[in-house]
Amino acid sequence: MTALRRTISIIFVFYLSCTLFVNIFGVQARNLCKTDEDCVLRCQDPGANCILGICHCSRQQVETELTKVIRCKTDRDCPDSHQCPKDYYYACLNNGECTCISV
């Protein structure tokens, strides 16, 4: 009976160890790249490169934040940028709306 309990415990610990091992390396594998094509798809940028297993996007991506709609024709029509979060500023986008953006 003791041998059976010990065998079941060893199998359970082995199963748990394998599960954790696969989960840890599965998370890391998602952040890595093998070819430039992987990076082109991730960055949505034809100039992206895979360097030492890490994607490097050639162009900067613009982050936008949703704000209340303010109509504009130029950036001067938008309110002061101090109303935007840090490192953001107001810009008049093509659709004629002021939006806080970060470049």
UniProtKB/Swiss-Prot annotation:
Keywords: Antimicrobial, Disulfide bond, Fungicide, Plant defense, Secreted, Signal
Superkingdom of this protein's organism: Eukaryota
Coiled-coil ranges from the UniProt annotation: none
Subcellular location: Secreted
Cellular-component GO terms for this entry: extracellular region
Principal cellular location given in the protein's record: secreted
Residues making up the signal peptide according to the UniProt record: 1-29
Gene Ontology terms: biological process: defense response to fungus; killing of cells of another organism
Disulphide bonds in the chain: 33-50, 39-55, 43-57, 72-92, 78-98, 84-100
UniProt similarity note: Belongs to the DEFL family.
Name assigned to this protein: Defensin-like protein 290
Organism for this UniProt entry: Arabidopsis thaliana (Mouse-ear cress)
Top-level taxonomy: Eukaryota, Viridiplantae, Streptophyta, Embryophyta, Tracheophyta
